[in-house]
Every structure is written in structure tokens, then in C-alpha cells.
């Protein structure tokens, strides 16, 4: 996998290559980009491992050196094709307000209904917790 990435394969091309090879993924179906990324970002590649939220290094011999691992991570990061989505949200507190009961982020909801007494469409915007009954 590492050699293919260094040769310029995209994650999709690598997944297709692995599907055509004899390498069988853990669940036995097709290779997914997410599972390939988990493997390529795992510190086990250079001999480290995660324990209680910390990365312990030098526990065993890795497949590549730590320097090569860091170069691989930079390469993967530089190849990412993510762009910030521009939003024209009317919810100014979106993802900023927390539920006072459970601490999860409040979601935004918008409803439009027709009010008969003055024959108008009324827009109602509000925030609610997904975990509230």
C-alpha cells in the first residue's frame, strides 16, 4: 500500500488495485477508502501503538521509519481534496450552542406554516436537542 501511494496512486486507485489482488479486507467484501486510511494512518507502521490515548513508540520494529511515516502523513494530507463548504445558513448559532442537559450540540430546525388569521406564511426557526424526549 505504502509503495503504491508513493508512486502516486490515489486512494480510490489503491482500493481498486487491492480489490483485483488477492488481498482480502477484514470483512471480506471490497476495500474502502476509509479502511485504507485507517491502515495508512496507524502508528503501528513505524513501530508505535496507541494506549490510553497516547502513542507509545519503539515497542517493536515497524514496517517503515518514523520519518517515512511522517512523510506519508504529509503526502496523504496534501492530496486531500477538501474545500470548506460555503453556507448561507440563517442559523447563526449553528454548532455553537450546547444542550444544558446532556452537552450535545443543538440542531437547527426551520418550519414554515400558513397562518389563517392574516393569510401569511410564517417562518419559525428554532434549536433543539436531538436527545430530548
UniProtKB/Swiss-Prot annotation:
Residues 1-82 bind DNA. Pfam families: Recombinase. One of its GO terms (molecular function) is DNA strand exchange activity. This is Uncharacterized immunity region protein 5. It comes from Bacillus phage phi105.
Amino acid at each position: 500500500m505504502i509503495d503504491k501511494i508513493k508512486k502516486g496512486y490515489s486512494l480510490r486507485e489503491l482500493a481498486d488495485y487491492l480489490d483485483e489482488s488477492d488481498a482480502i479486507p477484514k470483512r471480506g467484501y471490497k476495500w474502502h477508502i476509509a479502511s485504507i486510511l485507517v491502515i495508512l494512518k496507524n502508528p503501528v507502521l513505524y513501530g508505535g501503538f496507541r494506549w490510553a490515548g497516547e502513542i507509545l513508540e519503539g515497542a517493536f520494529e515497524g514496517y517503515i521509519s518514523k520519518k517515512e511515516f511522517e512523510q506519508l502523513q504529509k503526502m496523504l494530507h496534501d492530496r486531500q481534496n477538501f474545500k470548506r463548504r460555503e453556507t448561507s445558513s440563517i442559523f447563526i448559532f449553528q454548532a455553537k450552542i450546547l444542550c444544558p442537559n446532556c452537552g450535545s450540540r443543538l440542531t437547527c430546525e426551520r418550519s414554515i406554516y400558513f397562518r389563517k388569521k392574516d393569510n401569511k406564511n410564517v417562518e419559525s426557526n428554532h434549536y433543539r436537542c436531538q436527545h430530548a424526549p
